[in-house]
A protein has these predicted regions:
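Solvent-exposed, well-ordered amphipathic alpha-helical segments
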Residues: 1-3, 25-33, 115, 225-229, ...
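N-terminal non-catalytic cap/leader segment that marks the start of a structured domain
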Residues: 1-45
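Active-site environment of non-heme Fe oxygenases that use a 2-His-1-carboxylate facial triad
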Residues: 2, 9, 13, 42-213
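Short glycine-rich, polar/acidic loop-and-turn segments at beta strand-coil junctions
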Residues: 19-20, 68, 243
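Short active-site-adjacent helix-start/loop capping segments
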Residues: 23-25, 71, 248, 260
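Residue-centric detector for conserved, function-critical "anchor" positions
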Residues: 212-278
Length: 278
């Protein structure tokens, strides 16, 4: 696992043989793969669908972007793509090293470098819009936010021109292989492909600290993290054995967490919609 983290630290990505652990149990899957418990995970099948509008569900060319849906104010640190079946033609992954691009801009286009760090921009994604600088500090290191939608603002247009000069890494990930990408560092995209057989599972993982600097340990969410695993479908018996508690205790944790979340959301619903005191 240390070799894998070293490779991620050095290159920003790694392709490894898929592990036996099923990504249907995403917390345990991430832990077994990289040796670190995530704070949060998001699991999604990536398969082409007829008339899909999103890049994830379509077969169209996908421009460079980051996966930038936040958890507790930060985008996921790691994107994991488990390949069950590659496309017959096309579909290769494209990667661009955002940190290398920043290093170059600091030397050759310092005004744009500063704008990327300081200028809040509207980044449009299918999951919703995000407004923040293109690169921002996350727990002591730089994390990119970049939309696949064409830029219309001056900073975004300049960035698009600069990206055309950057080296592009192209990877054909095959069945039985897993691609890991540092989502804070690397921009990723995909070539168009033909057919409807391409079948991946994507797991996004958020960590308490930057992954390559982290060490083993339990999730910072503690018992709440266990409850979230339970709600995501991990077998209570398996969780109880791992945590050294009874299944009845797990259900007590779940019920308490759900009751407190329900109360908090209902209190939020009772606030006047024009309220801006937060």
């Amino acid at each position: 696992m240390s070799d894998l983290l070293d490779q991620l630290r050095k290159s920003g990505y790694a392709v490894v043989p898929s592990i036996a652990k099923d990504p249907d149990e995403p917390w345990a899957f991430v832990h077994e793969l990289v040796g670190v418990w995530p704070e949060m995970v998001e699991r999604q099948p990536i398969r082409p669908m007829a008339r899909a509008k999103s890049f994830a569900g379509g077969a169209m060319f996908t421009p460079f972007h980051t996966d930038s849906q936040d958890f507790l104010g930060a985008p996921p640190g790691l994107q994991i793509m488990v390949c069950h079946r590659a496309a017959a033609t096309g579909g290769e992954t494209r990667l661009l090293d955002g940190w290398a691009l920043l290093d170059r801009l600091q030397r050759t286009n310092h005004d744009l470098y500063e704008s990327l760090k300081r200028t809040p921009r509207l980044h449009r994604f299918y999951f919703g819009d995000v407004t923040r600088p293109t690169v921002a500090d996350v727990d002591g290191h730089v994390a990119w936010t970049h939309s696949p939608m064409p830029a219309t603002d001056d900073v975004g247009l300049q960035l698009a021109r600069e990206m055309q000069s950057e080296p592009v890494i192209e990877l054909a990930v095959l069945a039985g292989e897993t691609l890991l990408v540092d989502n804070h560092r690397m921009l990723h995209g995909r070539h168009a492909f033909s057919g409807m057989d391409r079948d991946f599972v994507r797991v996004l993982a958020w960590f308490a600290r930057p992954l390559c600097n982290d060490g083993p340990g339990r999730p910072g969410l503690g018992r709440l993290g266990v409850v979230v695993e339970m709600l995501a479908g991990v077998a209570p018996a398996r969780l109880a054995a791992r945590e050294g508690v009874s299944e009845a205790t797990l259900y007590e944790w779940r019920n308490r967490a759900m009751a407190e979340a329900k109360a908090a959301l209902e209190a939020d619903d009772r606030e006047p919609r024009g309220y801006s005191g937060r």
